[in-house]
């Protein structure tokens, strides 16, 4: 076959397969058999392999999966992916309607209602009609680049019907039938099954090997247009029609409503129809349809005023409470958990539910053997709602909390003003294990690859008993553990070694000193600069620091007034763990050449590691200016948790947005 003929046939096959994909995955109206589709796909793959010069990034053949990735790169969203406020009942919906009408002087308002797909929110970027990048929502400001995995989803067009540049947003999901099939295969292979379709979709999309995602039969509904060049959109319903014309899959079950009564009727209708869908939904999204009215209403600090998400009531089921087990946390708090006869709740099998503390058990009169009502709080955490007293037989047993720790047999105490029982033995194995999990966590020593499962294995193998023991681990020890190979063992040893270079505040937070969070740990580290100086500090010296109260100061002094802790710090020194502050102090920033010099910066949302007042001082010390509102003259918005209206303003004025992690990286350069 000549090159010219091969090129022509490749183009014919691509057009043909794109048409087949659109008919099957978007229109749900296949025109050919699976066998014919596969035959054409194999011919295309063969021709492209023989003629690599004709390979294209938007060829249907890329949907079978490409190169295995090492990591997912971070992506900063051009416009933040905001969350929505929630409504839980009819009253909440009417309150929303009243707020909307007050905000627009009771002008005529039309709502558009859509099913809230229970999947993974993603953004899709197209340049002149070609799919160039896809990303997860992440924290709303920064997500992960999952382009290669999204290319395997056949409902996502690789080339649009127009050469337009835009960003679309939607929900990737796994159909129920695909979920059942996947779990059946995993069970047959002796693998852990997914709890629900949402977890399956998220787990599939975040596979580093796109070939795995390609096998999972994922789909996607596009629900919004974040921005589009050279086109004016007047309403949300118009944007959905436009997206459909471009070749996207939009959900057909949307409806425009003229009154809140029509909205409520739509909600009730889909609450009934919900079980009959082939995909999971967890509510209804209601939006003001008119874009001009959306802009007039604006946003709050957390969410747009023109939209709300109605959450379906949590499913409640009845099951029998067969026992109560206890767990000990890293601070010694002993928490009771109900053991239940297995029951399906909101798509997952539930065997345990939180009982929180002894007072709750007494208040609800929960006894072993009771029939209880269980639901998932926020559709996530199982909890016991109440006891069905009319089902009691008299054989149920009252439960009494133990007087001694279930892990170490030390006497339990109830501290003043606390409802929880607590083990105060510093050598309690359960506390040590939970403390180790905290020590290696992201905001502490951030040791990649060392999660709860591995910590448990190391603990059970008696390889670690203290934080310092982590730094004596060898590759040979790791190779003795389940699921560890040469590469993973080498990587973990290196990750542990790298953590020695962390700045002091990470180590302080990782130690788990009571009342000391990430922000306080940074305050102490910057103030004292070394661990030795902090250890010697008195309660009065600690209380003299801004935002450090008496309770925290007493806790820090008590923590370091312990021979075991001092021995631990000595071991850290011997292993070469850094115990000095590596960040810059405000006094040191005056003569530093900085990104922030001459820049106007806006801080919004809650900053976890560094408070906004401290961040403001540092930016100003570096020659920057911090203002309270976003305008055309703003150079940067730093967005913490629950940032809202200022993000929308940043998008309007095309201002760059950083999350806290990116901000700290720049500060510490």
Curated annotation (Swiss-Prot):
Binding site residues for Zn(2+): 405, 408, 423, 428
Recorded GO MF terms: DNA binding; DNA ligase (NAD+) activity; metal ion binding
Cofactor(s) demanded: Mg(2+); Mn(2+)
Gene Ontology biological process: DNA repair; DNA replication
Record's GO cellular component terms: cytosol
Residues where NAD(+) binds: 34-38, 83-84, 114, 137, 171, 287, 311
Pfam families named among the record's database cross-references: BRCT, DNA_ligase_aden, DNA_ligase_OB, DNA_ligase_ZBD, HHH_2, HHH_5, Nlig-Ia
Domain of life of the source: Bacteria
InterPro entries: BRCT_dom, BRCT_dom_sf, DisA/LigA_HHH, DNA_ligase, DNA_ligase_AS, DNA_ligase_CS, DNAligase_adenylation, DNAligase_N
Swiss-Prot/TrEMBL catalytic activity: NAD(+) + (deoxyribonucleotide)n-3'-hydroxyl + 5'-phospho-(deoxyribonucleotide)m = (deoxyribonucleotide)n+m + AMP + beta-nicotinamide D-nucleotide
Transmembrane residue ranges: none
Keyword Ligase: yes
EC class name: ligase
PANTHER family: CHROMOSOME TRANSMISSION FIDELITY FACTOR 18, DNA LIGASE
Family: Belongs to the NAD-dependent DNA ligase family. LigA subfamily.
Name listed for the protein in its UniProt record: DNA ligase
Organism (species): Bacillus cereus (strain AH187)
Name of the coding gene: ligA
């Amino acid at each position: 076959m000549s090159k010219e003929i091969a090129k022509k046939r490749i183009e014919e096959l691509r057009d043909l397969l794109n048409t087949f994909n659109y008919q099957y995955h978007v229109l749900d109206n296949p025109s050919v058999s699976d066998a014919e589709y596969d035959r054409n796909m194999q011919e295309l793959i063969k021709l492209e392999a023989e003629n690599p010069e004709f390979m294209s990034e938007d060829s249907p053949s890329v949907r079978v999966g490409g190169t295995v990735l090492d990591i997912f790169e971070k992506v900063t969203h051009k416009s933040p992916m905001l969350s929505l406020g929630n409504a839980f009942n009819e009253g909440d919906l009417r309150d929303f309607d009243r707020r909307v009408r007050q905000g627009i002087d009771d002008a005529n308002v039309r709502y558009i209602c859509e099913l809230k797909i229970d999947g993974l929110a993603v953004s899709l970027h197209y340049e002149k009609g070609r799919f160039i990048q896809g990303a997860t929502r992440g924290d709303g400001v920064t997500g992960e680049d999952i382009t290669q995995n999204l290319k395997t989803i056949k409902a996502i067009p690789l080339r649009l019907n127009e050469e337009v540049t835009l960003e679309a947003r939607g929900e990737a999901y796994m159909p129920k039938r695909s979920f059942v099939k996947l779990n059946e295969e995993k069970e047959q292979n002796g693998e852990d099954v997914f709890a629900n379709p949402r977890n399956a979709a998220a787990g599939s999309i975040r596979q580093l090997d796109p070939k795995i995602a390609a096998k999972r039969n994922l789909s996607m509904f596009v629900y919004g247009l974040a921005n589009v060049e050279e086109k004016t959109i007047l309403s949300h319903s118009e944007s959905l029609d436009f997206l459909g014309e471009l070749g996207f899959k939009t959900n057909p079950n949307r409806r425009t409503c003229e009154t809140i009564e029509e909205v409520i009727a739509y909600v009730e209708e889909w609450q009934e129809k919900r079980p009959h869908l082939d995909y999971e939904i967890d509510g209804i999204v209601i939006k003001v349809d008119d874009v001009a009215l959306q802009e007039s209403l604006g946003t709050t600090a957390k969410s747009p005023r023109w939209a709300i998400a109605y959450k379906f009531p949590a499913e409640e089921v009845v099951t029998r409470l067969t026992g109560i087990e206890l767990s000990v946390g890293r601070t010694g708090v002993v928490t009771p958990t109900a053991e239940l006869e297995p029951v399906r709740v909101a798509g997952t099998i539930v065997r345990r539910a939180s009982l929180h503390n002894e007072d709750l058990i007494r208040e609800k009169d929960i006894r072993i053997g009771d029939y209880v009502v269980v639901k998932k709080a926020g559709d996530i955490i199982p909890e016991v709602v109440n006891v069905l007293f009319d089902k009691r037989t008299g054989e149920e047993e009252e439960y009494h909390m133990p007087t001694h720790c279930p892990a170490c047999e030390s006497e339990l105490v109830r501290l003043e003003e606390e409802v929880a029982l607590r083990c105060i033995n510093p050598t309690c194995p359960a506390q040590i294990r939970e403390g180790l999990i905290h020590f290696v966590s992201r905001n502490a020593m951030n040791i990649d690859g060392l999660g709860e499962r591995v910590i448990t294995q190391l603990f059970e193998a008696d390889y670690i008993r203290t934080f310092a023991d982590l730094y004596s681990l060898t590759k040979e020890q790791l190779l003795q553990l389940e699921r560890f190979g040469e590469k993973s063992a080498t990587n973990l040893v290196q990750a542990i070694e790298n953590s020695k270079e962390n700045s002091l505040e990470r180590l302080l937070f990782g130690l788990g000193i009571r009342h000391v969070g990430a922000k306080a740990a940074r305050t102490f580290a910057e103030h004292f600069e070394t661990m030795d100086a902090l250890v010697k500090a008195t309660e009065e010296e600690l209380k003299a620091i801004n935002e450090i109260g008496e309770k925290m100061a007493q806790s820090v002094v008590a923590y370091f007034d312990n021979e075991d802790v001092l021995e631990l710090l000595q071991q850290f020194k011997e292993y070469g763990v850094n115990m000095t502050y590596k960040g810059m102090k405000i006094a040191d920033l005056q003569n530093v050449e900085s990104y922030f010099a001459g820049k106007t910066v806006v801080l919004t949302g809650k900053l976890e590691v560094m408070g906004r007042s401290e961040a403001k001082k540092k930016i100003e010390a570096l020659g920057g200016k911090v203002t309270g509102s976003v305008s055309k003259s703003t150079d940067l918005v730093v967005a913490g948790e629950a940032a809202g209206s200022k993000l929308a303003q940043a998008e309007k004025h095309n201002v760059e947005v950083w999350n806290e992690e990116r901000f700290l990286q720049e500060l510490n350069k």
